[in-house]
UniProtKB/Swiss-Prot annotation:
Low complexity bias: start-end ranges: 498-507, 644-656
Residue span of region Disordered: 460-562, 618-704
Species: Ciona intestinalis (Transparent sea squirt)
PANTHER family (UniProt xref): FACT COMPLEX SUBUNIT SSRP1
Biased composition (Acidic residues): 470-484, 508-520, 686-704
Keywords, in A-Z order: Chromosome, DNA damage, DNA repair, DNA replication, DNA-binding, Nucleus, Transcription, Transcription regulation
Function: Component of the FACT complex, a general chromatin factor that acts to reorganize nucleosomes. The FACT complex is involved in multiple processes that require DNA as a template such as mRNA elongation, DNA replication and DNA repair. During transcription elongation the FACT complex acts as a histone chaperone that both destabilizes and restores nucleosomal structure.
Protein name: FACT complex subunit SSRP1
GO cellular component, one term: nucleolus
Subunit structure: Component of the FACT complex, a stable heterodimer of SSRP1 and SUPT16H. May also be a component of a CK2-SPT16-SSRP1 complex, composed of SSRP1, SUPT16H, CSNK2A1, CSNK2A2 and CSNK2B.
InterPro entries named among the record's database cross-references: HMG_box_dom, HMG_box_dom_sf, PH-like_dom_sf, RTT106/SPT16-like_middle_dom, RTT106/SSRP1_HistChap/FACT, SSRP1-like_PH1, SSRP1/POB3, SSRP1/POB3_N
GO molecular function, one term: DNA binding
Predominant place of localization: nucleus
Length: 704
């Protein structure tokens, strides 16, 4: 709640609509009361001069504020705390010149009592106290029987539980001239929202093309509702259920969409139509005559409508609809796309259509139609495919309620205009990088996708940066840690062992070598797996280990803010029952900014005292040897030093088994391990020599 001398602002208030509670924002201003529905965006405005009475009473959801207007219309708002009564009472008294009365309800639970009709409501009273009340505009039908009256109610799809009907038994009167049942029925029907076709329509539009629901309909305009008469179905739409009107030009500039937003929607079986979409051709003309007398037309519409009207069909229909429904018509605003078109061709849910960027939202037509207000949008996202032949991108919208809308196959040439529009409307863009390069990459793309694809270039650049980062991490490691003589010997063995089979010849030699390889194959594989595992561990950048907290170290003092929060946490929970930890923290942060500096200074002094004690305790703790950590010497060895061959060879055990690839003639003649190793690297293996000798011998035998 925000309080100011000029207004009261409540951001978490609920309005009842045919059994469903819709959350929204309520503002009590000096001259009017405004409520905005968060779901539909509909704004209800109550002028100060139209207020008749105001009531405050206890209901299931905290407390309720009820306003009744001079016309009998009623507005109810739930979700107030009991402590708000005095503040609201003073505000209503000072600015609206009416008293906010506290009304007590009857809780006896009796099902008999008396009824009273006041305004648009029927009140059921028990013992001179109100038990319940029924808004008569929620009644869809009322029938009378001998001693009973049955009331049926409109249903709301958003309501989990709905009241279907109520029956009232009315005992007969002793006076035969008075029929109480009929009087009760007439009082209900006088205010009920029953759509009955009585008299002639104000005007009729014949054979209009309708995209949703699909077909051709005759549209009849009555004083309180619209009737759509088709070959198969009939629909009735009350003027109060119409939220918005849109007049949107087709891309070909020859057709016009006229869109009517509905809440509650039209129903056809299990199908719901939240939008009525009519399609007009600009060259079609229409002449219509209103059935109202001239003086009534002048009084109701103030010269904005005439008895006889003619012109383009879309202009006449939209003009009559606007003044009968009393809703403004929304048209495209400042957005100009490719070739000056005010719409964007795209695909939504496998159907092609048009996306219209409007001044306060986006409208997509026509299958299925979608309207997204800017205040519903959490962020937008520009995405595109990775193929080189793709010359389009996707426009994604995520709402605050976590609903995603993806409009795909948008031409790349539309990107610049759509990006500028989104940026000017200050919508959050999800995928803008730290360098802001996404816009340039899309706009500067060559038209020939085979020549240059900036998206692929960006992906390659990011991959190169990641590889460079991994290489930098590898360079930081010490070479001494990597040096393992035994592993190096095993690697050399594997390198030379791979060519042994190809160097040998003769059946007997191959059989012998195959037998030896079977024996040695398993340990060699295990060595190879171990080496590869160590390599992978080396290539993977190591994780930064968090330093373990010393349990014996003195605890740091809390800041002034947390000292204040701990002292006031109980008060926040008491004032806001059921509040989450996140919301409590936000609320506390806002109040901390607003508190008096002297109050803040009090907690600052408490923090300084605690800090002095902490510094002294930490000094004593360190003087006793606390907080010291030992570092491994291996991590400190970062300098590269040359390694002599003797040092490396001496680390290999003389009794270490060597495969026959390493045994050369020099091994039997030289006593130095280093000489043997050098020769084994520079001279071919012994098996290769023996293999060549055996080949030569076999050639001689064949020649003989």
């Amino acid at each position: 709640m925000t309080e100011n001398g000029q207004f009261l602002d409540y951001k978490n208030v609920f309005q009842e609509n045919r059994g469903a509670m819709h959350d929204g924002r309520l503002q009590l201003l000096k001259e009017k009361i405004v409520f905005k529905n968060n779901k539909t965006g509909k704004i209800d405005s109550i002028q100060q001069n139209d207020l008749h009475s105001a009531l405050w009473r206890r209901v299931a959801r905290d407390f309720e504020l009820k306003f009744q207007m001079n016309s009998g219309q009623v507005f109810r708002f739930d979700g107030f705390k009991e402590m708000e009564f005095e503040r609201l009472k003073d505000f209503v008294k000072n600015y609206y010149k009416i008293d906010l009365e506290h009304q007590e309800l009857s809780g006896k639970g009796w099902n008999w009592g008396t009824t009273d009709f006041e305004g648009n409501e029927m009140m059921f009273q028990v013992g001179q106290k109100l038990s319940f009340e029924i808004p008569l505009n929620n009644v869809s039908q009322c029938t009378q029987n001998k001693d009973e009256v049955t009331m049926e109610f409109h249903q709301n799809d958003d309501s989990e539980l709905s009241l279907m009907e109520m029956r009232f038994f009315i005992p007969p009167s002793q006076d035969e001239m008075i029929d109480k049942v009929k009087d009760f029925h007439d009082n209900v029907m006088a205010k009920a929202d029953v759509l009955q076709v009585k008299g002639t329509a104000i005007c009729v539009f014949q054979d209009l093309q309708c995209l949703t629901p699909r077909g051709r309909y005759d549209i009849r305009m009555y004083p309180k509702f619209i009737q759509l008469h088709g070959k198969t179905f009939d629909y009735k739409i009350t003027y109060t259920s119409i939220l918005r009107l849109f007049l949107l030009p087709h891309k070909d500039q020859r057709q016009i969409f006229f869109v009517v937003s509905l809440d509650p929607p039209l129903k056809q079986g299990m199908t719901r139509y939240h939008f009525l979409i009519l399609l007009f051709y600009k060259e079609d003309d229409l002449a219509v005559e209103l059935s109202l007398p001239d003086d009534e037309i002048e009084e109701r519409f103030g010269g904005k409508l005439q008895k006889d009207m003619s012109g383009p069909m879309y202009e006449v229909v939209s003009r009559v609809m606007k003044h009968l429904v009393q809703r403004k018509i929304t048209v495209p605003g400042s957005f100009k796309g490719l070739n000056g078109v005010q719409s964007i061709t795209c695909t939504y849910k496998a159907s092609s259509g048009f996306l219209f960027p409007l001044e306060r939202g986006f409208m997509y037509v026509h299958k299925p139609p979608v309207h997204i207000r800017f205040d519903e949008i959490a962020y937008v996202n520009f995405a595109r495919g990775t193929t080189k032949i793709n010359k389009s991108f996707d426009f994604e919208i995520e709402t605050r309620s976590k609903n995603n809308f993806v409009f795909s196959n948008i031409e790349r040439d539309q990107y610049a205009s759509l990006y500028d529009f989104v940026h000017n409307k200050q919508l959050k863009i999800k995928n803008i990088g730290k360098d802001g390069a996404d816009f340039d990459l899309m706009v500067d793309s060559d038209e020939d996708a085979d020549v240059h694809d900036p998206y692929m270039e960006r992906m390659k650049q990011e991959a190169a940066e990641r590889e460079k980062q991994v290489d930098d991490d590898d360079d930081d490691e010490s070479e001494d840690d990597d040096f393992q003589p035994e592993t190096n010997v095993a690697e050399v063995e594997e390198e030379y062992n791979s060519d042994v089979g190809s160097a040998s010849s003769g059946a007997s030699d191959e059989e012998e070598e195959d037998g030896e390889e079977e024996v040695e194959e398993k340990p060699k594989k295990r060595k190879k797996e171990k080496v590869m595992k160590e390599r992978r561990q080396k290539e993977t950048p190591g994780k930064v280990k968090r330093k373990k907290k010393d349990p014996n170290a003195p605890k740091r003092p809390q800041s002034a803010y947390f000292l204040w929060l701990n002292e006031n946490r109980g008060r926040f929970k008491a004032e806001n029952k059921g509040i989450s930890v996140t919301e409590l923290t936000k609320l506390a942060g806002k109040e901390w900014k607003k508190i008096d500096p002297d109050e803040k200074q009090k907690f600052e002094r408490m923090y300084q005292k605690s800090k002095v004690k902490f510094d002294a305790a930490m000094k004593e703790y360190k003087s006793q040897g606390g907080g010291r950590t030992s570092s491994s010497p291996a991590k400190k060895m970062k300098m590269k030093s040359p390694k002599p061959s003797k040092a490396s060879s001496s680390m290999v055990s003389p009794s270490k088994f060597k495969s026959k690839e390493f045994i050369t003639e020099s091994d039997s003649l030289s006593s130095s391990d280093s000489d043997a190793e050098v020769k084994s690297k520079n001279s071919p293996p012994a098996d290769e020599e023996s293999a060549s000798e055996s080949e030569a011998a076999s050639e001689e035998e064949e020649s003989d």
